[in-house]
A protein has these predicted regions:
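Short amphipathic alpha-helical interaction elements and helix-loop-helix interfaces
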Residues: 93, 97, 126, 181-184
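Conserved catalytic cores of phosphodiester-cleaving nucleases, focusing on short active-site segments
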Residues: 87, 118-122, 126-143, 151-157, ...
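Charged, glycine-rich intrinsically disordered N-terminal tails and low-complexity linkers that flank
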Residues: 1-86, 90-94, 141-165
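C-terminal folded domains that constitute the principal catalytic or ligand-binding module
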Residues: 162-185
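Short amphipathic alpha-helical face segments that pack within enzyme cores
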Residues: 82, 119, 173-177
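A short acidic/basic microdomain associated with nuclease active sites
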Residues: 88-113, 118-121, 130
Length: 185
């Protein structure tokens, strides 16, 4: 659609102006009509001939991403700053130059119908650039996250003696989309 076309300069300006994400009216309006990375898992698993109506509505309407009053969503938004700071502190112990920067809405001019809003951009001299997507699951709010690893429908799994993001979970699709759209390795 022509209405979604964007130059690189406009994309850079949009990302800068939307770093407050949910507190930015511009963030909401520019998500409308774009398939955002948070929807990639659902898009990849919906029927092409008969797509999920709620998925289509979620992409086409601005109001759908303004939802509040959902305990799991509210919990995640409330805990995100603390989780970000704990992650930053943990990384600084072994990565002296580690930094997290706020991120806005990224739109790649080559694919203007797609968008991504990671929770932050990360960088350090030894590891390079990346991004962070923070998840604070309401479902395990009263337990140790390590106990949930490998549980059915949980997004983390044991793999080769380590804990990894499940490649079949919607969060995997979200993060892969974010990495591509934000042009992070």
């Amino acid at each position: 659609r022509d209405g979604l076309k964007i130059t690189q300069g406009e994309a850079d300006y949009l990302e800068e102006c939307t770093k407050l994400q949910r507190q930015s009216a511009l963030w909401y309006s520019h998500r409308k009509g774009r398939i955002t990375a948070s929807k990639f898992g659902a898009v990849c698993h919906t029927s092409i001939s008969s797509p999920s109506q709620s998925l289509v509505e979620g992409i086409l309407t601005e109001e759908n991403c303004r939802r509040r009053g959902i305990p799991a969503l509210d919990w995640g938004l409330e805990k995100e700053p603390c989780a970000r700071e704990e992650y930053r502190q943990a990384m600084k112990k072994t990565h002296v130059t580690f930094m997290i920067e706020q991120a806005g809405l990224f739109v790649n001019p080559l694919y203007p119908n797609l968008g991504a809003s990671p929770d932050g951009l990360v960088s350090c001299t030894c590891c390079g650039d990346g991004l962070i997507e923070i998840k604070c699951p309401y479902s395990i709010r009263d337990s140790n996250p390590a106990a949930a690893v490998g549980r059915a429908n949980f997004y983390l799994e044991h793999s080769e003696g380590d804990v990894k993001l499940s490649r079949t979970h919607a969060y995997y699709y979200q993060i892969q989309g974010q990495l591509a759209i934000c042009d992070r390795p």
